[in-house]
Swiss-Prot record:
Coiled coil: none annotated. PANTHER family: BETA-2-MICROGLOBULIN (PTHR19944:SF62), MHC CLASS II-RELATED (PTHR19944). This is Beta-2-microglobulin. The lineage of its organism: Eukaryota, Metazoa, Chordata, Craniata, Vertebrata. It is found in: Secreted. Residues 1-20 form the signal peptide. Disulfide bonds join C45-C100. Component of the class I major histocompatibility complex (MHC). Involved in the presentation of peptide antigens to the immune system. GO terms for cellular component: cytosol; external side of plasma membrane; extracellular region; Golgi apparatus; HFE-transferrin receptor complex; MHC class I peptide loading complex; MHC class I protein complex. InterPro entries: B2Microglobulin, Ig-like_dom, Ig-like_dom_sf, Ig-like_fold, Ig/MHC_CS, Ig_C1-set, MHC/Immunoglobulin. Belongs to the beta-2-microglobulin family. The keyword Signal applies.
Length: 119
């Protein structure tokens, strides 16, 4: 009985230590298919390698938040860092600019990464 209590306490202490670890997210913005003006596509923002799990991700069109956005479930890697995919259907054009804005405790201000249609 006493040994199981000690093990439980050690597990709780090690898990509470995970909250102190902070890793900034890596942000990748890309389209599902090569960009063609006027042709429907999907805009993806893959955010990975972050800890803790609290994060805010927005897809932007010309600096304004896109409302109809879907995302994957929050998942974690073997190193206990987290990852997410946010995506939306869009139709690229020469005049529009798309980006992904991420807010996380590791950033003093939100970080915005622009979509490069040539990638």
């Amino acid at each position: 009985m006493a040994s199981s209590v000690v093990v439980a306490l050690l597990v709780l202490l090690s898990l509470s230590g995970l909250e102190a670890i902070q890793h900034a997210p890596k942000i990748q913005v890309y389209s599902r298919h090569p960009a063609e003006n006027g042709k429907p596509n999907f805009l993806n923002c893959y955010v990975s390698g972050f800890h803790p799990s609290d994060i805010e991700v927005d897809l932007l069109k010309n600096g304004k938040k896109i409302e109809k956005v879907e995302h994957s479930d929050l998942s974690f890697s073997k190193d206990w860092s987290f990852y997410l995919l946010y995506y939306t259907e869009f139709t690229p054009s020469e005049k529009d600019e798309y980006a992904c804005r991420v807010s996380h405790v590791t950033f003093s201000t939100p970080k915005t990464v622009k979509w490069d249609r040539n990638i």
